[in-house]
């Protein structure tokens, strides 16, 4: 199931050489934890969206660990919002370990009120 109805969307290529996002996925039954490291921006957000699309049908809990996320853009926020909407009625979604800069973006955009933050 695609988050936004786009089943064939391919991850964007890293053209800038500056944007990088490492995504590690840990699975425990139907609970998934995504550990994000780097930048979640226009270049890298399709990669996260694709990985979330792979698991959202089976997931009962989705945790995004942002302890090593340096930056998040509006494109990254869109992917997080899509994940939240996809998990609605299926299970829980938790965002944890926000860095100061990411926490400030969440506060400014109102995302702090939308997500279960640990």
Residue ranges, per PLM feature:
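N-terminal leader/presequence segments that are low-structure
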Residues: 1-14
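STAS-typified acidic loop motif
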Residues: 11-48
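Amphipathic alpha-helical interaction surfaces in cytosolic regulatory modules
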Residues: 42-115
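Conserved catalytic-core motifs of GNAT/GCN5-like acyltransferases
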Residues: 118
């Amino acid at each position: 199931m695609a988050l936004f109805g786009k089943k064939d969307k391919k991850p964007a290529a890293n053209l800038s050489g500056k944007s990088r996002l490492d995504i590690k996925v840990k699975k425990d039954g139907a609970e998934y934890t995504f550990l994000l490291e780097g930048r979640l921006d226009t270049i890298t957000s399709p990669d996260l969206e694709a990985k979330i699309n792979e698991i959202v049908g089976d997931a009962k809990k989705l945790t995004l660990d942002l302890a090593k996320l340096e930056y998040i853009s509006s494109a990254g926020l869109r992917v997080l919002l899509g994940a939240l909407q996809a998990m609605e009625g299926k299970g829980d979604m938790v965002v944890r370990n926000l860095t100061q800069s990411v926490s400030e973006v969440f506060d400014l955009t109102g995302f702090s009120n939308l997500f279960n933050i640990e």
